[in-house]
């Protein structure tokens, strides 16, 4: 869900805002679909189905265009690493966490991705160093993460009945960290067409998850899931992964990386709304407080809030 492309335009038309809102709804829907599916499909098998079906859909979309096959043959090692840190690891961690937490909370924890991206880029790159504003935004985002994880984790340490286990809260955060590494590593794919990069990493991550799912879940022994689960898997793979990537890169081509990154703020509200309407999930006050801290941190990282305040004060 992160990109390192250079910003192209700072002007957002109503059409681009509408597309950005649609993308936020779609990616928020991925947490909803996953919450439905993990009730009947083990996490590793679910990751395999999501990635495999999405990769197939993107290959059908590309139909051999943009040099997809030479790119796969020539850069398969890079695609394997990108697929590992941008798909296989984060998806597996999020789905494992969602066996115990709701769609909304998982989306909020994953919304810390830009915070980790900034911190990792400060060490891993030469051109994206921390500024005072970025550091402040990171602190707010990390504070929001602590608020979200802290109360449940402390209660769990004392054995309170019904509390969410600590690992279920930590795994989505580790998924966000993995996305942060992939954002810096992904810079090496700038010379490829964006759909080729997406198809390449999805193909590679499918190959990574295939032996994991076979050895751990033994999917051939699983009962046939109900129709609602099948539909959730199709929605997760085709809508929230394959189509979302195409939409994401289309917005980025017109609006640039900075504007497109605002989708991170739109994902948790849509996941929370879908979880509330269809799954009966309710957020605690600490969840809302943590989300607001993370949102404030992301707004500072984006930079436009500070620019508006500076302009108003002149």
Residue positions per predicted region:
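Transmembrane alpha-helical segments that form core, pore/gating elements
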Residues: 58, 117-119, 123, 141, ...
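Membrane-interface helix-cap regions at the ends of transmembrane helices
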Residues: 29, 33-36, 40, 54-72, ...
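Glycine-/small-residue-enriched transmembrane alpha-helix faces in small-molecule transporters
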Residues: 2-48, 84, 96, 156-188, ...
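Helix-helix packing/entry segments at the starts of transmembrane helices
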Residues: 49, 87, 105-112, 183-207, ...
């Amino acid at each position: 869900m992160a990109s390192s492309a250079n910003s192209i335009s700072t002007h957002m038309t109503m059409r681009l805002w509408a597309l950005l809102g649609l993308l936020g709804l779609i990616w928020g829907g991925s947490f909803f679909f996953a919450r439905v599916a993990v009730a009947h499909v083990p996490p590793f098998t679910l990751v395999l189905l999501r990635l495999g079906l999405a990769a197939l859909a993107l290959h059908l979309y590309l139909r051999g265009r943009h040099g997809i096959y030479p790119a796969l043959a020539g850069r398969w090692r890079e695609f394997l690493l990108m697929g590992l840190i941008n798909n296989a690891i984060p998806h597996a961690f999020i789905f494992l966490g969602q066996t115990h937490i709701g769609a909304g909370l998982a989306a909020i924890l994953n919304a810390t991705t830009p915070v980790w991206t900034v911190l990792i880029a400060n060490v891993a790159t030469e051109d994206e160093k921390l500024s005072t504003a970025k550091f402040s935004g990171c602190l707010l985002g990390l504070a929001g993460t602590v608020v979200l994880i802290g109360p449940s984790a402390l209660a769990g340490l004392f054995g309170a009945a019904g509390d969410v286990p600590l690992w279920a809260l930590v795994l989505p955060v580790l998924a966000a960290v993995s996305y942060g590494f992939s954002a810096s590593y992904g810079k090496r794919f700038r010379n490829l067409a964006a759909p080729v990069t997406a198809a390449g990493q999805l193909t590679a991550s499918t190959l990574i998850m295939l032996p994991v799912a076979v050895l751990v879940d033994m999917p051939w022994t699983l009962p046939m899931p109900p129709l609602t689960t099948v539909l959730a898997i199709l929605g997760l793979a085709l809508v929230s992964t394959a189509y979302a990537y195409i939409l994401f890169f289309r917005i980025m081509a017109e609006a640039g990386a900075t504007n497109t990154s605002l989708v991170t703020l739109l994902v948790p509200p849509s996941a929370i709304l879908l979880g509330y309407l269809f799954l009966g999930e309710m957020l605690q006050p600490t969840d809302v407080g943590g989300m607001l801290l993370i949102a404030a941190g992301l707004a500072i990282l984006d930079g436009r809030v500070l620019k508006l305040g500076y302009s108003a004060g002149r």
